[in-house]
Amino acid sequence: MDELKKGYKVIKNFLSTEEINLLTDYTRMKHRVNTTQFDLGQSDQGDTMFYGDPATDSLMLNKRKLMEKETGLELLPTYSFWRMYSYLADLKKHKDRPSCEISVTVKINSCGAKWPIYMGGTEIELENGDGVAYKGCDIEHWRNEFEGDWHAQTFLHYVNKNGPNKEWFRDKRPLFGITK
């Protein structure tokens, strides 16, 4: 896994322009009508969050080959989710659970406000469509408070097909595109 020797790797243009446009519209529309899907786990803000969304689970499946190329590993997809962050949102410093052994966090789009992610103390600013592949269980990652209006981010998670966490395939769900 030399490709992730620092624990992370920036992948420019992880999403195409068409994927950015599609996911921007999709996440903003779902956010506007959301009344039930909020996450208080990694942020104090209670931002819109969708686990196992069919759109991002499909993206995770379609980006597996790219992730294998970027990491040098054979990967099994586990789950995806996306969040729409708002003013004063943050991401608490943490490491991930076993189903997030190899992950990529991807900036879909935002209001334009800068909001870096920190990987093991290194500040990384992503442009729309860029991603950071990282060893989710090994490297601490976080974000400070967001000072913009909106920021759409997706997270695609995988495990090493030949590693100790392969039991987490599909995050132990019977199908992709559903919650547990």
Can you describe what each PLM-predicted range is?
Residues M1-T71:
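Non-heme Fe(II)/2-oxoglutarate
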Residues S86-W142, W150-T154, V159-P174:
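Catalytic core of non-heme Fe(II) oxygenases with the double-stranded beta-helix
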Residues T17, D57-L61, L76, H94-S99:
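Alpha-helix initiation and capping sites
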Residues N62-L66, F81, S103:
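Generic beta-strand or strand-like secondary-structure segments
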Residues G72-F81:
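A short coil-to-beta-strand element that immediately follows conserved catalytic motifs
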Residues P174-K180:
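Charged phosphate-binding loop/patch that engages nucleotide di/tri-phosphates or the phosphate backbone
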Residues V10-I11, L76-P77, A133-Y134, F155:
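A structural signal for short, well-ordered beta-strand segments and their strand-loop junctions
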